[in-house]
């Protein structure tokens, strides 16, 4: 596996590749990231992973400075997973001048759900992803379903800019107790980690209720928020949405996704479960 840090070295490493599959990350990798690399390998060509903690997607008071930088350990995991090339630029390599141009993500996607609590976040995500797409020029890019809103933002950006990239979604990996794997789980204290699976359980309860015929979506979400708040969580949102557009679900909505973001102590956790009328949880 080759590791490069500059744009010139990245281009040289890919100069003879007819196609590639790309997995963008911020590092501090876990088994969920590894599964995305393994999924990328199914699509032919070298697998490229990026490791870059993107300052544009962090707001004031967020965890940019304390986000773990674990490049050596990350490269070991990527090599074991069969990754071919790692692009690990520093900030000056990816942003050689002030990034005054940004991707303008529509408010319906950028200012709802996580965007309502993290202003500018999705513009920062879309901007860095577009830059990385321009540099790597992949035919396939793999993103995790755990960051569901991010996945839809990237898909819509690719569609609207006519980018010749197939966006592939990888399933959310979970610990045995149901907690979705996340680089930020390491922030949790032992007591918080023991409580954290409640978030997934609340989403699963909503999915089960919908599968059982419940259709008062507002009441289901409100009850989950109340239970989480009563257990000491600080809830940003619990919502039931159209899985394709993230618009508020109605009785006619066929594909549903239940999404949540909530804080345990100083750690913000997100999760989601998709709903299908026949099979319940899809991911």
From Swiss-Prot:
Keyword terms, alphabetized: ATP-binding, Cytoplasm, Ligase, Nucleotide-binding, Pantothenate biosynthesis
NCBIfam families (alphabetical): panC
Organism annotation: Thiobacillus denitrificans (strain ATCC 25259 / T1)
Record: residues binding (R)-pantoate: 57, 150
Quaternary structure and interacting proteins, as annotated: Homodimer.
Locations listed in the record: Cytoplasm
Disulfide-linked positions: none
Gene3D superfamilies named in the record: HUPs, Pantoate-beta-alanine ligase, C-terminal domain
GO molecular function: ATP binding; pantoate-beta-alanine ligase activity
Superkingdom to which the source organism belongs: Bacteria
SUPFAM superfamilies hit by this protein: Nucleotidylyl transferase
Further remarks about this protein from its record: The reaction proceeds by a bi uni uni bi ping pong mechanism.
Sequence similarity: Belongs to the pantothenate synthetase family.
One example of a Gene Ontology biological process annotation: pantothenate biosynthetic process
UniProt EC number: 6.3.2.1
Active site annotation, chain numbering: 33 (proton donor)
InterPro entries in the record: Pantoate_ligase, Pantoate_ligase_C, Rossmann-like_a/b/a_fold
Binding residue positions for ATP: 26-33, 144-147, 173, 181-184
Role: Catalyzes the condensation of pantoate with beta-alanine in an ATP-dependent reaction via a pantoyl-adenylate intermediate.
Stored Pfam families: Pantoate_ligase
Protein name (database record): Pantothenate synthetase
Xref: PANTHER family: CYTIDYLATE KINASE/PANTOATE-BETA-ALANINE LIGASE (PTHR21299), PANTOATE--BETA-ALANINE LIGASE (PTHR21299:SF1)
UniProt pathway annotation: Cofactor biosynthesis; (R)-pantothenate biosynthesis; (R)-pantothenate from (R)-pantoate and beta-alanine: step 1/1
Reaction equation(s) it catalyzes: (R)-pantoate + beta-alanine + ATP = (R)-pantothenate + AMP + diphosphate + H(+)
């Amino acid at each position: 596996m080759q590791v490069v840090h500059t744009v010139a070295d990245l281009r040289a490493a890919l100069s003879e590749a007819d196609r590639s599959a790309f997995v963008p990350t911020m590092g501090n990798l876990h088994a969920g990231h590894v599964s995305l690399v393994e999924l990328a390998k199914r699509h032919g060509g070298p697998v490229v992973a990026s490791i870059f903690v993107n300052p544009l997607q962090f707001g004031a008071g967020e965890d940019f400075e304390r986000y773990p930088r674990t490049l050596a350990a990350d490269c070991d995991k990527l090599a074991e997973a069969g990754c071919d090339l790692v692009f690990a630029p520093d900030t000056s390599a990816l942003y050689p001048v002030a990034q005054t141009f940004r991707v303008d993500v529509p408010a319906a996607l950028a200012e709802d759900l996580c965007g309502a609590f993290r202003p500018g976040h999705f513009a920062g995500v879309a901007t860095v992803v577009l830059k990385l797409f321009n540099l790597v020029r992949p035919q396939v890019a793999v993103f995790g379903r755990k960051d569901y809103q991010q996945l839809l933002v990237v898909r819509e950006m690719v569609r609207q800019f006519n980018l010749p990239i197939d966006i592939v979604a990888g399933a959310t990996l979970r610990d045995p107790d149901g907690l979705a794997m996340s680089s930020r789980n390491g922030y949790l204290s032992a007591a918080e980690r023991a409580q954290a699976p409640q978030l997934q359980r609340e989403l699963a309860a909503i999915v089960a209720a919908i599968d059982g015929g419940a259709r008062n979506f507002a009441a289901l979400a409100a009850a989950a928020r109340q239970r989480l708040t009563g257990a000491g969580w600080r809830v940003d949102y619990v919502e039931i949405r159209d899985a394709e557009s993230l618009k508020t679900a109605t009785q006619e909505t066929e594909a549903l996704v239940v999404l949540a973001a909530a804080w345990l102590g100083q750690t913000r956790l997100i999760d989601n479960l998709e709903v299908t009328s026949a099979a319940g949880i899809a991911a």
